Structure formats: structure tokens, C-alpha cells
Amino acid sequence: MGLPSSLESYLLLILLSFLNVSTIYSSKPSKEEAVLFGGNFPAFYVIGDSLVDPGNNNHLPTMIRANYPPYGSDFEGGKATGRFSNGKTIADYIAIYYKLPLVPAYLGLSDDRKDTISTGMNYASAGCGIRRLTGKIAGKCLSLSKQVDLFEETIEKHLKTNFKTPYELREHLAHSLFMTVIGVNDYAFFYTRLTDANDFADELLHKFLKKIEKLHKLGARKFFINNIKPLGCYPNIVAKTFMLGLRGPSTNRYSSNLLNTTGPCCPLDYDGSLTSSCKRRSKTCKAPDSTHIFFDPRHPTQLANFMYSIACFDERTICHVV
């Protein structure tokens, strides 16, 4: 299934692939590649799940949270912000690359504070997905539909106060970057051996594209879309493709020192059904940012996120522009 015809001529789709690693750099970069690698985005809006949640779930009644040590041990000030990592996420590094502030969790801001921010918002919610019911067994979370609704709320209630005319607001949105990292939890919670793989994928793609279309109607034009990673032998497959994709001179400096490419850095607190995360205030491996790809069984260390950003933007080996 392709993009709705009304979108094809307007969207810049940037795929960060953790599976199909391919080099897109050429001696004559396309206009789209120039936008990606040399762009000057005024704002960065993030929609997604736990890979990029900066703390929205801290403000929701849910079991899926990361607002306690050892999460955040290497973040600024050693604070557990709600990020499912020892430090920064890939969304943080994208913001840094484009010289933007780290994008704040929407639910963690007062209305007055939201009125003052025009450099982006993060609506990502750990455990949630494309389907409305995904992750709800663990409590409340923000589905794809809800996150898009919150972006619409951002425009109507907050962004309009920052721009003198509707034209200025439209230009702001048209030149901003929108990241989506969502879909793997739909498989984790709902996919079984009895599920028809093609039908399930078609359903998710249809729902996803409907929300992309809504974002487009609201003014979004440039998208950074993260591919869904595989389930099953998750750590082994991701680690293998991670090492294959990060073979440039810069990433080799870091990857050559990795001691554990599949195991988590922190002791686990496994509830048997919903999620596996770090035990509260547990001791982690001594140097997660030099030895491990995974901080817990499903989420990368700050080092891994940093290496992804280098491979995407500097070495240009894992990002593909279409």
C-alpha cells in the first residue's frame, strides 16, 4: 500500500532503517537529501513509543515508566526523566544535530509553558502503538491517534499565539521536522501465531497512513519515519544489523569497544507478562556507554543512540530518503 495520492507530491519521507541498511550518499545529492542533511528546521515534533518517550508516561496511570534509577544515570544531572535509557534518546540526538533544544514531554508542561515553546513538542508514550488499545492492559498511554490529537491541540491552543499571521504559522509547520517511531508494540501486544501477517500489517499501515494524512492536513510536510523492528529474537537481530550498519570510521571508534551486544546493562524486574525493565535503584554494568548496545532488554543505551545518529547524519549509512 502506497501513500495516499494527495500526499505523494508533498511529503519528504525519511526512513531510519534498523533492518535494511543501505548507503544513500552520492556525489550528487538530491534536493531531498540536501534538506535532510543540511536542513535548518525551526521545530521538531515527535510522535512515538518508549524509544523516544522523554517522560510523558510519568504523568499517566501506567505500569510502563522509566522515571526511576538506574534510568537516566548518564543523562544531564544523572536524573531519571522517564527516558528508557541511561541517557539521551535518538530523538534527543536529532534535536542536537539540528541545533534545537531537547524536545520536552508535552504532558509535563503547564499551559503557560506550552504557550512559549515554538521549537517542538514530544508526544511519545511508552507502551502505546498504532492501535487504540495497544498498551492499555498496563494502564493509560497515548495512542497514535491521541498523539496526533495533542499536536492539533498544540496548534490551536498554543502555537497560534507565537505567530502574527496564519501564513507564518503554516510556514513554520511546513518547514518543521516530524518524527514517528511507532508500531512495534502493536505486534508485541496483539500479534500471535494465528494472526494473518499480511492482514495485520495492512491494518496497521492503513491506520498509520490515515494519521500521516491528518498531520499533513494540519500542516506537516517533512517526516522522519522509523521502521518497525523485528520481534522474536529481538536483541540478536537488532545487534547484528546494528553492527553491520555502523561500520564507518566514526562509529567504528565506538563499536570496536563493545563487550556485550545482546544482553541488557541493568538487572531486570520482569513481571512475567507486560514488560521487562530495570529493577529500581539497581546497580548497572560499570560503563554502559562503552560496553553495551542495550540498557534494558528492549531499549538502547545512550551510546547506541549516539552511534545511530552518527551513522544516519554523518556517515549516511542507515538513513534513506524517498
Curated annotation (Swiss-Prot):
It is an enzyme of class 3 (hydrolase). The keyword Zinc-finger does not apply. It is found in: Secreted. One of its GO terms (cellular component) is extracellular region. Pfam families: Lipase_GDSL. One of its GO terms (molecular function) is hydrolase activity, acting on ester bonds. Keywords: Glycoprotein, Hydrolase, Lipid degradation, Lipid metabolism, Secreted, Signal. The active site is at 50 (nucleophile), 296, 299. Residues 1-26 form the signal peptide. Its EC number is 3.1.1.-. Belongs to the 'GDSL' lipolytic enzyme family. Glycans are attached at residue 260. PANTHER family: GDSL ESTERASE_LIPASE 7-LIKE, GDSL-LIKE LIPASE/ACYLHYDROLASE-RELATED. This is GDSL esterase/lipase At2g04020.
